[in-house]
Amino acid sequence: LLYLFIVPPWQHYDEPGHFEHAWLIANRPTLPQPGDFDPAMRRTVAASMIEHDFYRGGAPPDLSQPDPLPIGLSQIDDYVAYYWLAALPLRFLQDADITHQLYATRMVSLLLFLLSIAGCWGAIRELTQPNNSLRWLLPMCLALLPAFADIMTAANNDSAAIAFSTWLIWGIVRLIQRGFSWVWLMGCAIGSVACLWSKTTTFPVVAGLALALPLSLLRGRGRWLVWAVAAATTLFIGATIIQWDDARGWFRASNQEAGVRRAVSQTPVGQYAFALESSAGSGMQIQQVIAPELTEALRGQTVTLGMWGWTDSQEPQSGYLPVLLIATTQGVPDTSSPYQKILLTTQPTYYSITTTLPENTARLWLALTAPVKPAKATTTSTLFLDEISLTKRVANGIDLPGNFVINSSAEFGVVRFRSSWQTPFAQLLRADPNHFVGALLDPHTRSIYISKFMNLSLQTFWARFAWGHVALRNPGLNLLLNFILVSGFLSSSCAVSSQLVANRGNLSIHTVHTLIVLGLISFGVCIAAIARANYILFLGSWFPSARYIYPAVMPVLLAVVGGWVMLFRQITPHHSQPFGEWVILALFASLNIYSLISIVQFYA
């Protein structure tokens, strides 16, 4: 309840947009459609945002400007389950102050917070023996997890997605532990629908039901048939939706049906070349992320961009030399090197251009572009590019040896989602899945991607608040919290593995299957969260990514807390076993109090 009131109005991520969706449902007879807004409501919200110092350090909007007045990212196209619930109290508060209406919406999220804790209690109760301390410890730790409490008391659709996912996990655990039940199957079906109408982050949890149902029906050795079928199905689907014809280290900024890496007989270097298609109304661009240390080395320097280029068309085709996209802050590119147009023929020809980078260059991307043809064009042409180069030029006009471009001749390939699958996966993840796959399979971008995501997700899992910009007063605590999380995971993994190998009697076969399903659900949720975070490669903005992991917060927190319970039982005398549980609870309570102090001091 403290988090609900202690964070100022509108100071949760996208809270104005989430509130707007619920408000439109409450005040209109039909569901809002993308693009809908109420001018008077937006002005009232903007005035409230100004009143509560939302724009401190920035420029507030001019309330007299023409409609639509911006109040943040619109959420009208989001799934509606949360907004239906949030609209219920607003129907009775239509004449109330807009800030009071926001707090009423936050109260709905608070109720969903309580439902999440109840779902966690139900799931751990099914999974453990009556005297197991995790039955009371895990729900209390969840209630005291600061960043989770902050998310679950904000006006946002994550609260519904997390609450419904936690209850569905309870149903999944019960089905596997106790066997098939029509009542619980119906409950899981209702929970699945609620999840699917809440947010796409819940989809891996819903997929877990596809494993739980056959496992609830097969109670003997036949259960392993379920895993065999699941593995075979996964391999078949994987082989169906992916292909190996893109260039490693290069990311699509637009889409074409064919791969961008193609074997060509006349390449100046190697056996492959980049193949970018150009047609009426459609061009193609691929980009490479320049590593931060290379960006720093090139800042303010004169560089040469070069390439070999040709086309498969008998008519000369327009193309561009490589372009450097430049960000002078940690955000998106705000300038670039010149777009130098060239004419390509069937004969491979070398082209180059020299440019000087700004002294304040913060981030760099190298782009290869096939331009859009005129509207009257009826054919599609392929532009072939090879041996892309980025070199530093010294004062006497000589280029230093050493190419800064990775995989400059497309000799190394990488898998990608087929174009027919890329679009639905991108809509599901709100991000291009090929960026995620390409980043993980490229050793040069993998370290950037994973290190930034891990730092981002670990902080936001424990204690990062509001729009992700409010941190603990002492940043050094993050190292301790990360140690606690990783150690808990390792401890629980070792404990479960040792029991499976040394003494199966301590874990029932039902519990083994349940833990596997929970592990797969957590893995799926985390992979989806990592995929959503591919903006790390192209943007510098802060996103509270742990909210994408919270639909699986129950099994994730179980691994952390359960691991530390087992550690304490190894290092404390047998007669003082509850000591470890009380230490863990005290840690969560202390972190919670310190988090509240940090929030109060930030907004003071």
Regions from the PLM with identified roles:
Residues N27-T105, E257-A263, R418-Q459, A463:
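Interfacial juxtamembrane loops and adjacent helix segments
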Residues W184-K199, V206:
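Membrane-interface alpha helices of multi-pass inner-membrane proteins
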Residues A96-T99, C120-L144:
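Transmembrane-helix signature of polytopic, membrane-embedded enzymes
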Residues I176-Q177, V205-I237, A502, L507:
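Perimembrane helix-loop-helix junctions
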Residues G119-G122, A160-R178, M186, I190-S192, ...:
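Specific aromatic-rich, kink-prone transmembrane helix
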Residues V229-L477:
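Extracellular and organelle-lumenal recognition/adhesion modules and their flexible linkers in secreted
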Residues A104-T128, W167, S491-C494:
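Transmembrane-helix motifs of polytopic, lipid-linked glycan transferases
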Residues W462-I516, L520, V560:
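Hydrophobic, aromatic-rich transmembrane alpha-helices
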